[in-house]
Amino acid sequence: MRRYYYTRIVTIIFLIALITSPSYALPGNSYVVTEVHDGDTVSIKVKSFAGFPLKVEHVRLIGIDAPELRQDPWGRKAKKHLKKLLSESDWVVNVEFDIDQRDKGGRLLGYLWNRRNGSLINEKMLEDGYAVLYTFPPNVKYSERFIEAEKRSHSRGLGIWGNKGLTQYPAQWRKEHPAYY
């Protein structure tokens, strides 16, 4: 009789864990960010079981290009700023996709939305001066917003647009340092 009771309890606990654990992230294209790789790439948990990630995907933020980590000091600063923006969202973001959903390297391409205040994180990186505009058709849904955000940060001299700002665009830096990529 006791064994039956314990088996039943364990089964109920297992079912509760299974039901409350999102199988395909959270509803409404919401995902937990598990890692920030640099100022424009994160990892999200897309499948989990009882809170443990089973599948993680890399997401490249559409429309922006942040300095590379080896572009001192702006690469590290961009990564730190993206972490700050994600922490304001409790590391849970809504991911919106555009027409092309993956890049040549297999990363997902997405717009990250702060679930708490509704801000577009890609746009905030531009507006705060930690990334440059980097749009490629057909993924241009928010390109007008991004152009205006970069103009605002540039005119205010924020981040990479300040006195000791970025000396080289990230794309140009990658071209001149192919050994790192």
What spans do the regions from the language model cover?
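Small beta-barrel nucleic-acid-binding modules, primarily SNase/OB-fold domains
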Residues: R2-F14, I19-Y181
